[in-house]
Amino acid sequence: MDELKNLEFEPEITEKFEEGFNFRTVLAALFIGFIMLPGSIYLGLITGGGLGGAAQWVTVILLVEIAKRSFVQLKKQEIYIVYILASSLVSAGLIIGTGFLVLQGGAFSDLIWKQYLVQSPYAESFGLTPHIPRWAVPPPNSEAILKRTFFHKDWLIPIILVIVHNVLYRINMFSFGYALFRITSDYEKLPFPMAPVASEGATSLAEVSAKKETWRWRVFSISAMIGIIFGAFYVVIPTITGLLMTNPLQLFPIPWVDFTTQIENILPSGLFGFATDLGAILTGFVLPFWVVVGTFISSFLCQTIGNPILHKIGIIKNWQPGMTAIPANVVNTMDFWINVTIASGIVVGLIGLFKTITSFKRKFERIERKIPEGRGDYPIPIALLIWFLSTVVYIIICHILVPKFPILLFAFFGFFLTPFLSYTSARMFGITGVASGVAFPYVREATFILSGYKGAEIWFAPIPYFNHGYLAQSFKQLELTRTKFTSWYKAEFTALGIMLFCSFLFWSIIWRMAPIPSSTYPFAQKMWPMSAIFNALWATSTLEGGAKWMIEAIKLKSILYSTIVIYLIYGFILITKIPVAFFYGLVGGIVTLPHYAFPMFIGALLGRFYMAKKIGPNWQKYRPIILAGYACGFGLIGMVSVAVALIAKTIFQIIY
């Protein structure tokens, strides 16, 4: 059956497009940069969560409340621009290591990560340290590293590269993302089923701005109080005691309680524990039930039960008694699970690509619909030309930084993989609302290794390999809120300037207060080493005579067998008509630690079998607001503790 047969293009609403960027949104951006960003950085280092959606909610709520008391009614265009500004400023960050950790805090989070990597014992033990290029980070014996400061000449080139990359990336993403939107929305007329979610949220907040109190605010307020109370124990106590003690007091172990060493006599190499953040349970409320069930089953069977079996038959060889969750997960991954991860990525990616290709069988009306007046459009060829030129600049920069790497491979990333991946992703957003199954697993790493290049510089270069598919849905949301596209351009580049300055300022202050990671930042101290190990393993795989652990860990036979098994599971799920979401949960659970899968599963069970019956049909509406309210309250109390810590440590440094 054609999956698209019921997807018909609906005529757009006829409201006039309006400007969403003005002085009020600039003030909101400044508030986010100077108030929310440092809180996000500090909380990310302590708990690993950052502010996330809380930054968006807090900023919008504050703006709405100020406007109400000033007898000003905010337009939905202004509210939506502020909403995406908060996401851009606070959530922007770096995916480090294996991709499981996101380091929030703007552009300079990249340099903070690299200063840790260059002086980490893992980079040194693998022989990577002398090969890390100076244009990426100063050497570990530099005063810039020893004194923990960005105000040093050794940081000049890395900082310039960070700024150039952030400007160039936005030019690249806006131009190609706009072209994707025009193709998928105006020509192919895809429905983008998830786009109305954000647009309706902005509309609801605009109604609140008009002093219309709704049930949303009651639910949100109660949830926020829960977040404040829990955050007082989870964040405030460790933060405040960290000012007075070498090791902060933690009423709840951050980020989890780990039972790995306790169960090793029964389940050697098995992992088990549970995350102590209440947000993990609330996340189980919101995520699709079958996704959570699949994630928990897969995580428990693979990481808790499967590892001991693999250890007993000699596949997992490097596990040693006494290993906690992090080192045990590293050796288990290297011995076996990295091959299953690659296989699962291949399967999910091919499924997404197959759905995209088969969707072409639908006979779209290839006549472009009339472009709404005042939307902020410009010709597609101009957009593609801007994207082409920005990609060329990326290739030139990469060739200058890594002249020995084949320039044709830079072009392969920029002019083939990026467009293909982005277009496939954009179509998946247009058809299903999500594109989590569209990816080319480890193609970047495989290209580096198989290219014959010898050196480590390529692993630190700004390769023009991006997925801009989500931009098509973002432009669709702008259209639904009747916001001029130019509002987003102006807001994003204004936010970029604020983000660069605030990221530089607050990372400088926080890094100066204590080494990152250290006992002051418990989440970073526990989780960053795992990512550093994987980074070092990948980077040394292309060194002349360097470490070959990563290459040796990847076994084509294991990948092939795993791919076949995963495809058989997918086929069984289709035949038995089990929800396909269960399959994607199974795939995601392979690499999910039980520490997170277990509390999410508890949350999913509570939500489906208790809360849904207790509250009734409205539970479906309450779920996302409960999580957002909790995140807001948690973020607010976290920001208060962060403010106290920053002031106290700054005064302490001034005195002494």
Predicted feature locations:
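Alpha-helical multipass membrane-protein architecture
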Residues: 1-656
